[in-house]
């Protein structure tokens, strides 16, 4: 055994000498791992390495940027100065002051996000910043290490319809929407309504509420009676009753 060890040692020394003579170092032959922590195995100390979460977060960012009209936004780019400083009678303060307070609320929501965070409903006319703030929350929550999924209501309804009539997909999109830590459901009211849409929407809302997974909804619908007429009292009650609602004021910011 000692003889074999000695032979291996001599072989190692000879190889090292040959490498040096060729102008290389031993480090030149080490694998170039993308992640030196787990050496590209994805596991470290019996748990998933942080590189796995980083990769998943990058993929989610790419998905959201491709699916949303604005891409991921940041709170810093939300310009409250663009809102009127004239007092809005319904508010008792100006839209600028109101939106500044709402911006601060959203910052705090994202910073303290957890399963106990409330559902949010952003309602108001087109171009008032609903999607911007929802996507800014998404960006910050992603950075906090949570899984975030974005979909427009129209895209959700279309995808769920395809899955319903394709028995090979096993409702994968619905499952993803149900399981994300935070779901952004944008532009409610633009989707094509069918009995299937109503049924699946109720299932999605109910499942997420029962499993304490927050959802942020945005919509141009500001009249609750219109909500009820469109989505049925059962769905509207489940959605509106479980949300902290914010109405957006001002004029279309995209026209300025």
State the predicted function of each range.
Residues 2-36:
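Short, charged low-complexity linear segments at domain edges
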Residues 23-74:
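Interdomain "pre-motor" coupling segment immediately N-terminal to P-loop NTPase/helicase cores
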Residues 75-120:
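Pre-Walker A (pre-P-loop) alpha-helix and adjacent loop at the N terminus of AAA/AAA+ ATPase modules
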Residues 87-100, 142-179:
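Short glycine-rich substrate-engagement loop in P-loop NTPases that contacts/grips substrate
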Residues 116-133:
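Walker A/P-loop nucleotide-binding motif
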Residues 118, 146-147, 179-182, 211-217:
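Loop/turn-to-beta-strand initiation segments
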